[in-house]
From Swiss-Prot:
An example Gene Ontology CC term for this record: virion component
Coiled-coil region(s): 258-304
Protein name as annotated: Uncharacterized protein R161
Keywords (A to Z) from UniProt: Coiled coil, Virion
Intracellular or extracellular location(s): Virion
Organism name: Acanthamoeba polyphaga mimivirus (APMV)
Main localisation: virion
Taxonomic lineage from the root: Viruses, Varidnaviria, Bamfordvirae, Nucleocytoviricota, Megaviricetes
Entry's family note: Belongs to the mimivirus R160 family.
Length: 433
């Protein structure tokens, strides 16, 4: 009876765990992928086994024990640098949070960084473990989900009132234009690195010295705020550009191995093409909204009689259809935005894991789509093999072949076949070996 079996090693939290192994330039490398679904704590699930441990407890106990192996381990987490060194994030929070945030709390308590050397150090608590952030998306400020949420809120307000306000629609166009400009700045700098990487001047910065890169990512760079003068806004814009160039320069140029570089640059090129396609969709959506505004203006004095009533302007039925279509278009754009965000973070992690000779045993705790991308790139491009996995619809040999056949990340996640936040690693090697 598995619910009472203390010999079964089950972990509450990850929806799946996979172990991959491969060789890079004669160095054997192993990576463990802990796959998370970011859901509110009240909707979380867990293992039936009463002996199952929550993931943060399992990791802490494992990190304490791996000193016996004599190996150095590198633990990465889907977290931003500014959150790691922000003192507010280090304060004790006694309230139980989602699984990934419980891991983040553990991470913050043991993370060690030397600002003078700009270097992550091994932990005082877990001497055989180096802790690393993995999420650079906010620095590239392609993380525009808040802006899409703002648009959704505006559309929902109009939907509730069944009324299209041209001023609100103009505001939606401005927000989409803001997103477009943020994406454009990323594409422009990516193009500059592709054309002539040596000619790009990159200011040296230390991400972990800056707890906050900029005050509000949702403010259009061209807008002046009442409490900020032009010079302050210019400094803020330049700081964003410095961070953007700093991280993109790492992704394009900071490599020892030419083969790793060439393969990850292909991933970057595809990522840039995807963002360009997204830009075209944003432009079409802006044009659609502008056409609706024109139609509202042209029909505002038009009166239409019905059998039971009358209305001015666009009919209530057409209004509902227009708003519903806009909500669908924004949802498509927001989903595409998430996928593009994934690419920057994942290439950043893979560059470090693959190109650094001193990183041989890695563990990363991230969302399941990130893990799917790691599996896809490692298996297809670098001949890594999935050696162990908690859940899979296929045996290991067929699983690796199946990953090679797929490009859609959601399909790779689906190969697990279960989304319960419980993973069994009874048959995995001990101590992350």
């Amino acid at each position: 009876m598995t619910t009472l079996d203390k010999n079964i090693v089950q972990i509450n939290g990850p929806v799946n765990i996979a172990r991959l192994e491969g060789q890079i330039n004669g160095f054997n490398k192993v990576v463990y992928l802990f796959m998370d679904h970011h859901i509110p704590v009240q909707f979380q699930t867990e293992c039936d086994n009463i002996f199952a441990r929550d993931v943060q407890t399992f990791l802490a106990e494992s990190f304490r024990n791996i000193g016996e192996t004599g190996l150095m381990y590198d633990f990465f987490i889907e977290e931003r640098p500014e959150s790691i060194i922000n003192e507010d994030s280090k304060t004790t929070n006694s309230r139980k949070e989602g699984y990934i945030w419980e891991v983040v709390k553990m991470f913050n308590k043991v993370f060690k960084f030397d600002p003078k050397e700009n270097k992550v150090m091994s932990s005082n608590v877990f001497e055989n473990v180096r802790f690393h952030y993995a999420d650079i998306r906010e620095y590239i400020y392609l993380d525009t989900l808040n802006l899409y949420n703002d648009i959704r809120n505006l559309l929902q307000e109009m939907q509730e009132n069944n009324f299209m306000d041209p001023y609100i629609l103009e505001h939606i166009v401005n927000i989409l234009s803001n997103i477009f400009e943020k994406n454009k700045s990323v594409i422009d700098i990516m193009n500059s690195f592709e054309k002539n990487s040596e000619a790009n001047s990159v200011n040296k910065i230390t991400p972990l010295k800056y707890p906050k890169v900029y005050e509000d990512t949702n403010i259009p760079l061209t807008n002046k705020e009442p409490n900020k003068d032009a010079s302050t806004l210019e400094k803020q814009k330049n700081l964003r550009t410095d961070y953007l160039k700093y991280f993109l320069n790492k992704l394009y140029n900071s490599y020892k191995d030419k083969n790793i570089k060439s393969k990850l640059l292909l991933e970057l090129r595809q990522l840039k093409n995807n963002i360009t396609n997204l830009q075209n969709k944003i432009t079409k959506t802006m044009d659609n909204v502008k056409k609706i505004i024109e139609e509202i203006e042209q029909s505002k004095n038009k009166v239409t009689l019905t059998d039971y009533s009358f209305f001015m302007g666009i009919s209530p039925l057409e209004t509902r259809i227009y708003i519903a279509n806009l909500i669908n278009q924004i949802s498509i754009l927001a989903t595409a935005n998430i996928i593009e965000n994934i690419g920057f973070m994942d290439i950043f992690f893979l560059r470090r894991f693959l190109d650094k000779d001193y990183i041989t045993n890695a563990i990363i705790y991230s969302g399941s789509l990130h893990s799917a991308n790691y599996m896809k790139i490692l298996v297809k491009e670098f001949d890594f093999k999935v050696t162990h996995i908690s859940k899979s619809q296929y045996p290991i040999d067929k699983l690796n072949d199946s990953i090679k056949e797929r490009n859609n990340l959601a399909e790779i996640v689906y190969l697990a076949g279960s989304y319960t936040q419980c993973s069994d690693i009874t048959n995995f090697p001990k101590n992350f070996q």
